């Protein structure tokens, strides 16, 4: 098992959630979320986060339909992952993210009811779930 720092993004066309985790412990925590316009984030905010945490690997959630087929946002998520690699030179992997938003909403609702369900928290929590599922697949 490696001791890498891994960052995950929950890609969305209007908002992108971020989480950070350690491979050695297999744990992750929510960081923040960023507003996006048609899937395009403020790259300066992404750069600041990458410089602060210096991840060894970045995981980007890949939104698929329930039957595993791709949708329009799947293509945009792939572009986002490619741009992360191209702009910042980070190693990027894609991770199936089916139902992570549903799971994130349920988790947040259990902890704080409707007040906890703001979009930023949901997206950052979805990024945590994406990263934890990546850890689970490896160990």
UniProtKB/Swiss-Prot annotation:
Q: Which InterPro entries match?
A: RNaseH-like_sf (IPR012337), YqgF (IPR005227), YqgF/RNaseH-like_dom (IPR006641), YqgF/RNaseH-like_dom_sf (IPR037027)
Q: Can you say where in the cell this protein is located?
A: Cytoplasm
| Entry keywords, A to Z | Cytoplasm, Hydrolase, Nuclease, Ribosome biogenesis
State a single Gene Ontology molecular function. Answer: nuclease activity
**Pfam families recorded:** RuvX
GO biological process terms held by the UniProt record: rRNA 5'-end processing
Key word Aminoacyl-tRNA synthetase present? no
Q: What pairs make up the disulfide bonds? A: none
Per the UniProt entry, the Enzyme Commission number(s) are 3.1.-.-
The record, for SUPFAM superfamilies, names:
Ribonuclease H-like (SSF53098)
Record GO cellular component, one term: cytosol
Q: What is its main location?
A: cytoplasm
Task: Report the SMART domains cross-referenced here.
Answer: YqgFc (SM00732)
Looking up NCBIfam families in the UniProt record yields: RNAse_H_YqgF
Q: Briefly, what is this protein's role?
A: Could be a nuclease involved in processing of the 5'-end of pre-16S rRNA.
The record's similarity note reads: Belongs to the YqgF nuclease family.
What name does the UniProt record give this protein?
Answer: Putative pre-16S rRNA nuclease
Q: Which organism is it from?
A: Photorhabdus laumondii subsp. laumondii (strain DSM 15139 / CIP 105565 / TT01)
């Amino acid at each position: 098992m490696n001791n890498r720092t891994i960052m995950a993004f929950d890609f969305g066309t209007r908002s992108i959630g971020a989480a950070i985790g350690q491979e050695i412990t297999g744990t992750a925590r929510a960081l923040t979320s960023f507003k996006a316009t048609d899937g395009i984030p403020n790259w300066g905010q992404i750069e600041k986060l990458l410089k602060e945490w210096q991840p060894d690997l970045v995981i980007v959630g890949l939104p698929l339909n329930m039957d595993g087929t791709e949708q329009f946002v799947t293509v945009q998520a792939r572009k986002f992952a490619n741009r992360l690699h191209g702009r910042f030179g980070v190693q990027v992997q894609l991770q199936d993210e089916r139902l992570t938003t549903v799971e994130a909403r349920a988790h947040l609702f259990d902890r704080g009811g409707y007040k906890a369900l703001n979009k930023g928290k949901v997206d950052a929590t979805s990024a945590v779930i994406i990263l934890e599922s990546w850890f689970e697949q490896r160990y």
